[in-house]
Amino acid sequence: MDLSNRTVVQVVVLALVAQVTLSQHWSYGWLPGGKRSVGELEATIKMMDTGGVVALPEETSAHFSERLRPYDVILKKWMPHK
């Protein structure tokens, strides 16, 4: 009798653990697993009244290399053969 009670408890615990691990959280604009689609992100930004989607500026190669100049000096100091 003790073995059957123990088995029932184990099955119930297994079922509860399986339910918690397999359940998904759903909220407005979110896909299962906490992922967002690009369209939903755009809709959320518009919903927040930011005036639309903010475009990131494209960096020119000169500006980019200028930003990396301190790192280039460090690399030349520590790796003179390159």
From Swiss-Prot:
InterPro entries the record matches: GnRH, Gonadoliberin
Question: Gene Ontology cellular component?
Answer: extracellular space
> Pyrrolidone carboxylic acid modification sites?
Q24
Where does it live in the cell?
Answer: Secreted
Is Signal tagged as a keyword? yes
Task: Give the residue range of the signal peptide.
Answer: 1-23
Q: Which residues carry this modification: Glycine amide?
A: G33
Keyword field: Amidation, Cleavage on pair of basic residues, Hormone, Pyrrolidone carboxylic acid, Secreted, Signal
GO MF, one term, reads: gonadotropin-releasing hormone receptor binding
A Pfam family in this protein? GnRH
Describe the task this protein carries out: Stimulates the secretion of gonadotropins.
Q: Its family?
A: Belongs to the GnRH family.
Name of the molecule in the record: Progonadoliberin-3
What species is given as this protein's source?
A: Salmo trutta (Brown trout)
The lineage, from the top, is: Eukaryota, Metazoa, Chordata, Craniata, Vertebrata
